[in-house]
């Protein structure tokens, strides 16, 4: 209970930094679970660090800004407004966001921009298609019931499982990844 009160206070006073910390923690935990489920012999702490860094320094700030921009979309009919926001989110933001995540993740794996682009082209469609089976439902709940400062957190809670999937898909063996130690 003390942790929840602390988080609520932090969200009220410093929403972005709080969401960044929570996102990095949840994302790193999701990667740890993905590594465990894939029976990795040894925990790859740098892989977990990459996921945590990307989530806290790119994903959380992007979502923080995105949800505030999405709030500016207005309409008289609540149902139509929800559909409008959902379409903007899933058809405009989500494809670009997924592409940026995949590209940046590969760069953090020390891939060249060219190799990162090639891998993005290889993985993007399947990941985006799968995301359409998950995220529209999450966003309906988010947009209808969740206060603005908590939306990134709800996304990150669901992203715990989504990141397990992303981690599994994007961590397939790649020719010559240099380990960053």
Swiss-Prot record:
GO BP terms in the entry: regulation of mitochondrial DNA metabolic process
Chief place of localization: mitochondrion
Record's bilayer topology term: Multi-pass membrane protein
Protein name: Mitochondrial inner membrane protein Mpv17
Organism: Caenorhabditis elegans
Family matches, as InterPro entries: Mpv17_PMP22 (IPR007248)
Transmembrane segments annotated in the record for this chain: 20-37, 51-67, 86-103, 152-169
One GO MF term attached to the UniProt entry: channel activity
Function: Involved in mitochondria homeostasis.
Protein family: Belongs to the peroxisomal membrane protein PXMP2/4 family.
Subcellular location per the Swiss-Prot or TrEMBL entry: Mitochondrion inner membrane
GO cellular component, one term: mitochondrion
A Pfam cross-reference name: Mpv17_PMP22
Keywords: Membrane, Mitochondrion, Mitochondrion inner membrane, Transmembrane, Transmembrane helix
